[in-house]
Protein backbone atom coordinates (compact mmCIF):
# COMPACT_ATOMS: atom_id res chain seq x y z
CA UNK A 1 0.00 0.00 0.00
CA UNK A 2 1.27 3.45 -0.90
CA UNK A 3 1.61 6.13 1.77
CA UNK A 4 -0.15 9.45 1.45
CA UNK A 5 2.36 12.27 1.26
CA UNK A 6 1.78 15.76 2.55
CA UNK A 7 2.85 18.71 0.41
CA UNK A 8 5.97 20.48 1.57
CA UNK A 9 5.13 24.13 2.22
CA UNK A 10 8.58 25.26 1.08
CA UNK A 11 8.21 23.62 -2.33
CA UNK A 12 4.65 24.84 -2.98
CA UNK A 13 4.73 27.82 -5.30
CA UNK A 14 2.03 30.39 -4.64
CA UNK A 15 0.48 31.96 -7.71
CA UNK A 16 -0.97 35.47 -7.85
CA UNK A 17 -4.31 35.92 -9.62
CA UNK A 18 -6.16 39.09 -10.63
CA UNK A 19 -9.96 38.88 -10.73
CA UNK A 20 -12.11 41.66 -12.18
CA UNK A 21 -15.28 42.02 -10.09
CA UNK A 22 -17.02 44.41 -12.51
CA UNK A 23 -20.54 43.13 -13.23
CA UNK A 24 -20.03 39.93 -11.21
CA UNK A 25 -22.50 38.61 -8.65
CA UNK A 26 -21.20 38.98 -5.11
CA UNK A 27 -21.90 35.55 -3.61
CA UNK A 28 -20.84 33.49 -6.59
CA UNK A 29 -17.66 35.52 -6.96
CA UNK A 30 -16.85 35.21 -3.24
CA UNK A 31 -17.24 31.43 -3.27
CA UNK A 32 -14.82 31.10 -6.21
CA UNK A 33 -12.31 33.40 -4.50
CA UNK A 34 -12.57 31.42 -1.24
CA UNK A 35 -11.92 28.19 -3.13
CA UNK A 36 -8.74 29.63 -4.68
CA UNK A 37 -7.53 31.05 -1.34
CA UNK A 38 -8.12 27.66 0.27
CA UNK A 39 -6.29 25.79 -2.51
CA UNK A 40 -9.20 23.49 -3.35
CA UNK A 41 -8.55 23.96 -7.06
CA UNK A 42 -5.16 22.20 -6.75
CA UNK A 43 -4.30 18.51 -6.49
CA UNK A 44 -2.06 19.32 -3.50
CA UNK A 45 -5.01 20.50 -1.36
CA UNK A 46 -4.70 19.57 2.30
CA UNK A 47 -7.43 20.71 4.73
CA UNK A 48 -5.12 21.75 7.56
CA UNK A 49 -2.43 23.51 5.46
CA UNK A 50 -2.33 26.77 3.54
CA UNK A 51 -1.94 25.45 -0.01
CA UNK A 52 -3.89 28.25 -1.72
CA UNK A 53 -2.87 31.17 -3.88
CA UNK A 54 -2.97 34.96 -3.58
CA UNK A 55 -5.99 36.75 -5.06
CA UNK A 56 -6.19 40.40 -6.12
CA UNK A 57 -9.72 41.68 -6.73
CA UNK A 58 -10.08 44.87 -8.76
CA UNK A 59 -13.17 47.00 -9.51
CA UNK A 60 -14.82 46.01 -6.23
CA UNK A 61 -17.16 49.01 -6.50
CA UNK A 62 -18.80 47.45 -9.58
CA UNK A 63 -19.86 44.17 -7.96
CA UNK A 64 -23.62 43.53 -8.18
CA UNK A 65 -26.32 41.84 -6.14
CA UNK A 66 -29.66 40.66 -7.50
CA UNK A 67 -33.19 41.59 -6.52
CA UNK A 68 -33.75 44.19 -3.80
CA UNK A 69 -30.63 43.23 -1.89
CA UNK A 70 -28.98 46.57 -2.63
CA UNK A 71 -31.61 48.27 -0.41
CA UNK A 72 -32.43 45.38 1.94
CA UNK A 73 -29.07 43.72 2.68
CA UNK A 74 -27.60 45.19 5.86
CA UNK A 75 -24.11 45.07 7.32
CA UNK A 76 -23.61 45.29 11.09
CA UNK A 77 -20.62 46.47 13.05
CA UNK A 78 -20.22 47.21 16.73
CA UNK A 79 -17.81 49.56 18.50
CA UNK A 80 -17.80 47.41 21.64
CA UNK A 81 -19.45 50.11 23.73
CA UNK A 82 -23.07 50.13 24.92
CA UNK A 83 -25.30 51.34 22.10
CA UNK A 84 -22.43 51.12 19.64
CA UNK A 85 -24.23 49.05 16.97
CA UNK A 86 -24.03 50.55 13.49
CA UNK A 87 -26.20 49.25 10.65
CA UNK A 88 -25.53 50.08 7.00
CA UNK A 89 -27.23 48.97 3.78
CA UNK A 90 -25.39 47.50 0.80
CA UNK A 91 -25.82 50.73 -1.20
CA UNK A 92 -24.38 52.96 1.52
CA UNK A 93 -21.45 50.66 2.26
CA UNK A 94 -20.71 50.35 -1.46
CA UNK A 95 -20.55 54.14 -1.74
CA UNK A 96 -18.36 54.47 1.38
CA UNK A 97 -16.06 51.40 1.40
CA UNK A 98 -16.68 49.12 -1.62
CA UNK A 99 -13.70 46.87 -0.75
CA UNK A 100 -15.28 45.83 2.54
CA UNK A 101 -18.28 44.21 0.81
CA UNK A 102 -16.11 41.70 -1.07
CA UNK A 103 -13.86 41.17 1.97
CA UNK A 104 -16.80 40.36 4.27
CA UNK A 105 -18.37 38.01 1.71
CA UNK A 106 -15.13 36.05 1.24
CA UNK A 107 -14.24 36.03 4.95
CA UNK A 108 -17.60 34.44 5.74
CA UNK A 109 -16.72 31.55 3.40
CA UNK A 110 -13.33 30.80 4.98
CA UNK A 111 -12.76 28.62 8.08
CA UNK A 112 -13.44 30.32 11.41
CA UNK A 113 -10.03 29.56 12.96
CA UNK A 114 -6.37 30.57 12.73
CA UNK A 115 -6.04 29.00 9.27
CA UNK A 116 -8.94 31.13 8.03
CA UNK A 117 -7.29 34.28 9.36
CA UNK A 118 -4.04 33.31 7.63
CA UNK A 119 -5.87 32.63 4.35
CA UNK A 120 -7.68 35.99 4.55
CA UNK A 121 -4.35 37.85 4.53
CA UNK A 122 -3.78 36.55 0.98
CA UNK A 123 -6.83 38.44 -0.32
CA UNK A 124 -6.17 41.94 -1.69
CA UNK A 125 -9.23 43.99 -2.70
CA UNK A 126 -9.12 47.33 -4.54
CA UNK A 127 -11.97 49.58 -5.66
CA UNK A 128 -10.32 50.82 -8.85
CA UNK A 129 -8.71 48.98 -11.72
CA UNK A 130 -5.17 49.68 -10.44
CA UNK A 131 -3.29 47.65 -7.85
CA UNK A 132 0.26 47.83 -6.42
CA UNK A 133 1.13 44.15 -7.03
CA UNK A 134 2.54 44.31 -10.58
CA UNK A 135 5.93 43.04 -9.32
CA UNK A 136 4.35 39.66 -8.47
CA UNK A 137 3.34 39.22 -12.15
CA UNK A 138 -0.27 38.21 -11.41
CA UNK A 139 -2.17 36.06 -13.86
CA UNK A 140 -5.62 37.24 -14.98
CA UNK A 141 -8.36 34.83 -13.97
CA UNK A 142 -11.78 35.04 -15.65
CA UNK A 143 -14.73 33.94 -13.54
CA UNK A 144 -18.23 33.76 -15.00
CA UNK A 145 -20.76 34.30 -12.21
CA UNK A 146 -23.72 34.95 -14.49
CA UNK A 147 -25.28 31.65 -15.62
CA UNK A 148 -25.94 31.66 -19.35
CA UNK A 149 -24.22 35.04 -19.69
CA UNK A 150 -21.26 35.86 -21.86
CA UNK A 151 -19.46 37.64 -19.03
UniProtKB/Swiss-Prot annotation:
GO cellular component, one term: cytosolic large ribosomal subunit
CDD domains attached to this UniProt entry: Ribosomal_L13
Transmembrane segments: none
Cited function: This protein is one of the early assembly proteins of the 50S ribosomal subunit, although it is not seen to bind rRNA by itself. It is important during the early stages of 50S assembly.
PANTHER family tied to this protein: LARGE RIBOSOMAL SUBUNIT PROTEIN UL13M, RIBOSOMAL PROTEIN L13
Protein family per UniProt: Belongs to the universal ribosomal protein uL13 family.
Name the UniProt record assigns to this protein: Large ribosomal subunit protein uL13
Source species: Gloeothece citriformis (strain PCC 7424) (Cyanothece sp. (strain PCC 7424))
Phylogenetic placement of the source organism: Bacteria, Bacillati, Cyanobacteriota, Cyanophyceae, Oscillatoriophycideae
Name of the gene: rplM
Amino acid sequence: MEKTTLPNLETLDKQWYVIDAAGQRLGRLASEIAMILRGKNKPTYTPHLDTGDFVIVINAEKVIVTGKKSQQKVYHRHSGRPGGMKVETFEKLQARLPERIVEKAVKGMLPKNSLGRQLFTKLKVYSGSNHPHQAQKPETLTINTIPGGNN
